[in-house]
């Protein structure tokens, strides 16, 4: 009997299992599976999980809900898992934290899986690695899924085919078939109406427009239609606000948002206003596209216009009142101290004599 191998020898061998076999030691017993305590309550579904977050992610497949929403302005994409959202946010930030450590490469990637694919294709086996093993073929492919799709030509096996009546479309992978299935099933609105969206984005758009839930600022009670707008507004109440100073020489203007600073530089310093209102008779120009979109509401009768606080027109004061220095209280109409008109003066000599006196007696 050969002596038992050390741990170092076992690790350095091809597999730990081979080392145990050579040492006449049986393989380690499998780890006991954790009990599935979290069971799906939907009818005709027997899925169960050992962790609550796994069940939550599974339930989203039934409800169509995507609870993790990107709060970047103008985005609004939603995801089932929190790490999917974290991965998506890298698109906005441009961050690529995963770097290839191969000599002379240093290529960066936003996800670990993309880095792994890069290493497999470019460094471990830069040649096409998936070869068809059917007799007389030997075609090679870079991706395993491409090989599987190709082999269907040899076996005449149907690809992943849609079973919906009247469709018959087929796909190269089950994930693509599942994604296609939503075209027939759709995304049902969960707000009590019968709307069914063909895509998740379409459902989100419907929810924003048909089921607007305004959110309120807890400080000033101002209301907003979107949470990201409220989040941006809350910065105005922060004790220490970020201030963005104009970098142009001789300009001391400051702004609380990058958007306003960019708009200032483009319109004031560079005199660039490329976005023109195309409404007939308007022709106003703007430095930023968002500013043009905000302005377009003025021309759209179907949209709610901004409720501006309009000051009531100031009453015209008589010459006598202005000369007297008398200031009438706000909200009250001042007494009529106007001078008589020319026709009255000509017809009444008494009025002509009293007119200069009126200027001196009003207090």
From Swiss-Prot:
Keywords: DNA-binding, Metal-binding, Nucleus, Repeat, Ribosome biogenesis, RNA-binding, Transcription, Transcription regulation, Zinc, Zinc-finger. A zinc finger (C2H2-type) spans 38-62, 68-92, 98-123, 130-154, 160-184, 187-211, 215-237, 244-269, 275-299. Residues 301-363 are annotated as: Disordered. Pfam families: TFIIIA_zf-C2H2 (PF22110), zf-C2H2 (PF00096). This is Transcription factor IIIA. SMART domains: ZnF_C2H2 (SM00355). One of its GO terms (cellular component) is nucleus. Residues 338-350 have a biased composition (Low complexity). InterPro entries: TFIIIA_Zfn-C2H2 (IPR054599), Zinc_finger_trans_reg (IPR051061), Znf_C2H2_sf (IPR036236), Znf_C2H2_type (IPR013087). GO terms for biological process: ribosomal large subunit biogenesis.
């Amino acid at each position: 009997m050969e002596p038992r191998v050390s741990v170092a020898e076992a690790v350095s061998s091809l597999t730990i299992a081979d080392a145990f076999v050579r040492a006449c030691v049986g393989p380690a017993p499998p780890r006991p599976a954790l009990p599935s305590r979290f069971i799906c309550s939907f009818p005709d579904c027997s899925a169960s999980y050992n962790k609550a977050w796994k069940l939550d992610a599974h339930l989203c497949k039934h409800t169509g809900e995507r609870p993790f929403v990107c709060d970047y302005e103008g985005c609004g994409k939603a995801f089932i898992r929190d790490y999917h959202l974290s991965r998506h946010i890298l698109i906005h930030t441009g961050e690529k934290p995963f770097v290839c450590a191969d000599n002379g490469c240093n290529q960066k990637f936003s996800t670990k899986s993309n880095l792994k694919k890069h290493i497999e294709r470019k460094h471990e086996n830069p040649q096409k690695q998936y070869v068809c093993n059917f007799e007389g073929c030997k075609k090679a492919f870079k991706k395993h899924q491409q090989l599987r799709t190709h082999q269907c030509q040899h076996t005449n096996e149907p690809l992943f085919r849609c079973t919906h009546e009247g469709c018959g479309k087929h796909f190269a992978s089950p994930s693509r078939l599942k994604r296609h299935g939503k075209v027939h099933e759709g995304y049902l609105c969960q707000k009590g109406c019968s709307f069914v969206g063909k895509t998740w984005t379409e459902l989100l758009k419907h929810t924003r427009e048909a089921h607007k839930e305004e959110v309120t600022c807890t400080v000033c009670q101002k209301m907003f239609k979107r949470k990201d707008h409220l989040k941006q507004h809350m910065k105005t109440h922060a004790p220490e606000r970020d201030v963005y100073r104009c970098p142009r020489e001789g300009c001391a203007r400051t702004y609380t948002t990058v958007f306003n600073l960019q708009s200032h530089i483009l319109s004031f310093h560079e005199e660039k206003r490329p976005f023109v209102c195309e409404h007939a008779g308007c022709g106003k120009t703007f430095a930023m596209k968002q500013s043009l979109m905000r302005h377009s509401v003025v021309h759209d009768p179907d949209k709610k216009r901004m409720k501006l606080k309009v000051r009531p027109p100031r009453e015209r004061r008589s010459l006598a009142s202005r000369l007297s220095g008398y200031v009438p209280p706000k909200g009250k109409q001042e007494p009529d101290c106007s001078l008589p008109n020319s026709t009255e003066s000509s017809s009444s000599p008494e009025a002509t004599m009293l007119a200069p006196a009126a200027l001196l007696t009003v207090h």
